[in-house]
Amino acid sequence: MPDHSLFRLRILPWCIALAMSGSYSSVWAEDDIQFDSRFLELKGDTKIDLKRFSSQGYVEPGKYNLQVQLNKQPLAEEYDIYWYAGEDDASKSYACLTPELVAQFGLKEDVANNLQWSHDAKCLKSGQLEGMEIKADLSQSALVISLPQAYLEYTYPDWDPPSRWDDGISGIVADYSINAQTRHEENGGDDSNEISGNGTVGVNLGPWRMRADWQTSYQHTRSNDDDEFSGDETQKKWEWSRYYAWRALPSLKAKLALGEDYLRSDIFDGFNYVGGSVSTDDQMLPPNLRGYAPDISGVAHTTAKVTVSQMGRVIYETQVPAGPFRIQDLGDSVSGTLHIRIEEQNGQVQEYDISTASMPYLTRPGQVRYKIMMGRPQEWGHHVEGEFFSGAEASWGIANGWSLYGGALGDENYQSAALGVGRDLSTFGAVAFDVTHSHTKLDKDTAYGKGSLDGNSFRVSYSKDFDQLNSRVTFAGYRFSEENFMTMSEYLDASDSGMVRTGNDKEMYTATYNQNFRDAGVSVYLNYTRHTYWDREEQTNYNIMLSHYFNMGSIRNVSISMTGYRYEYDNQADKGMYISLSMPWGDNSTVSYNGNYGSGTDSSQVGYFSRVDDATHYQLNVGTSDKHTSVDGYYSHDGSLAQVDLSANYHEGQYTSAGLSLQGGATLTAHGGALHRTQNMGGTRLLIDADGVADVPVEGNGAAVYTNMFGKAVVSDVNNYYRNQAYIDLNRLPENAEATQSVVQATLTEGAIGYRKFAVISGQKAMAVQRLQDGSHPPFGAEVKNDNEQTVGLVDDDGNVYLAGVKPGEHMSVFWSGVAHCDINLPDPLPADLFNGLLLPCQHKGNVAPVVPDDIKPVIQEQTQQVTPTNPPVSVSANQ
């Protein structure tokens, strides 16, 4: 006859759980449920009183570790939820919703201030929020709460209100981006080796983020010429480019920033300064109200290093393979004029500037967005220039989609003021118009003369999402500036050195457009900028991409794309056309033809691209360039410790080159730390703790990262003020590891080090028999926990227990009624057969009081008085 002990062990606790979690709410069913106790097949004198479970929705008083779901959205962490018996009717039980838990609901301020509490203000008084329903679904380890939206703050998919924002934990961050290149000339030119890098180090203390940015370069050139002037040349540089600190002000939906910064304004042109600012943080707004993140596009003729800088400070650097590229992960906090430098492996350099677009400065009705800043302008190298300045700007949502905005900026000799109006046109988008007036007093002779200059600048901007057409006009705008109009940056140059202004803006047109025609398999992308000047010729930059996906017989997902581009800088223009045709080759590979025509260099290549897995891909190209054979390869791997890119190029009769790019960082906290990959230097990250279990795969942002030997991993580049999720890939767990909790969430403030812990059990599995000192066994439903407070087994009605996470010599405790009653110690070494009834004596602890938080003791004491002594509350693990 088969042994059904294991079956009873696994199924009996769930019979109780399902009965307890049937339909708990503030509205009780009139009909009771009757149980047949013979179903449990209890032996001996074992007794369990099931009368209390006959009330539908009844939950046995005790502590339950549950995932709280509010209106079908899980909160970030699991909570210990205490159930207490009803005051008037012990057959009913209620969940204790603590003030800390209720604070996560995101209630409106007037609702939260009028809440009433019971049990010495430790539990929310039931029945006071009309329409609120609470259900316990113990089979899913969940507390399901339904709350009318009228009680809650404004929400948006994957965006949480401020009450759920997490400042993270204190710690140290050190991020870096390193690029190395070596180049050998075959025609007697110079050989060169170059290393460049930038990064951020910093400290998090509570809500404060303190950072320091660095950048460095090393270049060694060796001439292959035989003349007497040839020789080696070495250039190297290291500098700390910026010191700064900031913190979030959630109650104001604002950010306080101190130190060296770049003026980011929705109205005025930016410049470097040292000082402080308080500003409404667009990142704290719902995604549909946030600003525009810069989109940088270009074409690399060979494998190239792309550097994005602003006023001399490197803010992004990476390597890209030959062909069109787009950089879209700078974040919406980057604004102003950006300088793009593309260094090709063949030695050519492309440079151009882009002006980042800004959304119309609109605000929700009744709300105000603002910026207040003050300090002193700063040149490169921490040198302060100019007088003390101050400025402010604001946008006020009046009503019916109208917004009024304006601002002022200046010092003793320079003042500018702006006034504008914006309109939300609903289905037709949003439009804004503003006028800025500047008054400049020049005390000494300059290229502009001496005296006062007054000028105006006019701007109109438009933005629209076409959701039904799967397209978006991200930004379209026009700006006209009079000849005597000056920005703060131009005034500083004139007053400091009297230098001639070059590039005195007259008109600027800019537009970014993206559209997908899904049914036709066509996508279009356009980025266009045109500048006219009072003192030099106009400048036009554009990038147009057209792609078409189609099926060709049995070959599916064939694509053809064409890119036309023109970039101009210092009267030097780079323009041309890039054509690509690709088709699948196997499951994860493609073959392609690529042609690049223009700027005096024509090239064509046949390429092979293969994606090895989610983290790794490579590309090989063979072709001709300037009638010479060329071969290049590119390899990229998103590792747990760093992102690694490798490249190699050979151009017949001209040069051979190779490149290496590393992007990563280190995060260290009191909970532990890890090395990791990253792209956003000094940015927000999530430290994962897998209870000391190594090689646990964690998915969060991009390819999976694996926990290190200490069971820690970091998910980097997570979104600020956005509901981020990380989860364990259960299909790739190490052998003898189990995850009883595999998903965590976090909504983190900017720059935070979030911390989340997974319940992971590592070790062997065993079937054991537990016996107390008097020969009896622990009661049915007793929990076996390890020293990490993880439940590793439940006792059945015969004292049998199926254990997980078994390790030689490990200590465990057996709990019932919420108390650890006895201890067991596993043998060392473990027997070869762990499924042959391993006997584990349980040593009695004596009279041990329940260990419960002080703030919940009144609840536990009350429930204990109302529970029959022969049937103590059962502490049920939600993870079983």
Language-model features, listed with the residues they occupy:
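Feature captures outer-membrane beta-barrel proteins of Gram-negative bacteria and organelles
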Residues: 165, 193-207, 231-250, 386-400, ...
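Short Pro-Gly-centered beta-turn/loop motif in secreted/extracellular proteins
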Residues: 88-97, 330-335, 711-738, 750, ...
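Short, ordered, surface-exposed loop/turn motifs in non-cytosolic proteins
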Residues: 60-69, 73-83, 692-702, 774-788
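Transmembrane beta-barrel strands of outer-membrane/channel proteins
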Residues: 176-180, 212-216, 256-262, 372-376, ...
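Short, acidic Ser/Thr/Gly-rich low-complexity loop/linker segments typical of extracellular
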Residues: 80, 703-712, 789-800
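Post-signal-peptide, soluble extracytosolic/periplasmic N-terminal scaffold domains
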Residues: 2-18, 28-290, 599-667, 677
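A short, amphipathic beta-strand motif
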Residues: 68, 296-298, 686-690, 764-773
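Conserved, compact domain cores that house catalytic/ligand-binding motifs in diverse enzymes
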Residues: 164-228, 368-443, 471, 610-616, ...
